[in-house]
């Protein structure tokens, strides 16, 4: 088992409904520590850079609009196998396929408005964390 850090976003659909505390509780119950967190309102341009890997996908513009439509909570989670653990706690991208008790099964409104984002690999976690946080903000 390896101590890892991963990146998470609580998306606009969840912040609009005041679900930040409930979602954070799910992370903590799973053994993940929140070592950095801030509430921000991304611009469409910031969302575009962050999701640049999807620029050629048909949902890209809609995703950038959504992610800049209201505040989000960006955070760094730390724990044993944090990337896999976070993905397990989040559940499948499509809430209809998400296991009971996962964040998306409980809180997501649709595939597009699925409440949370999480890194999928150590390399992407490092890039995503660095996009929003400086080293001094990571308090573990």
Curated annotation (Swiss-Prot):
Cofactor(s), names only, from the UniProt record: Mg(2+)
EC number: 2.7.4.6
Subcellular location: Cytoplasm
Superkingdom classification of source: Bacteria
Keywords: ATP-binding, Cytoplasm, Kinase, Magnesium, Metal-binding, Nucleotide metabolism, Nucleotide-binding, Phosphoprotein, Transferase
Catalytic activity: a 2'-deoxyribonucleoside 5'-diphosphate + ATP = a 2'-deoxyribonucleoside 5'-triphosphate + ADP; a ribonucleoside 5'-diphosphate + ATP = a ribonucleoside 5'-triphosphate + ADP
Keyword Metal-binding: yes
Entry keyword Metal-binding: yes
HAMAP family attached to this UniProt entry: NDP_kinase (MF_00451)
Subunit note: Homotetramer.
Designated name of the protein: Nucleoside diphosphate kinase
Organism: Ruegeria pomeroyi (strain ATCC 700808 / DSM 15171 / DSS-3) (Silicibacter pomeroyi)
Gene name tied to this protein: ndk
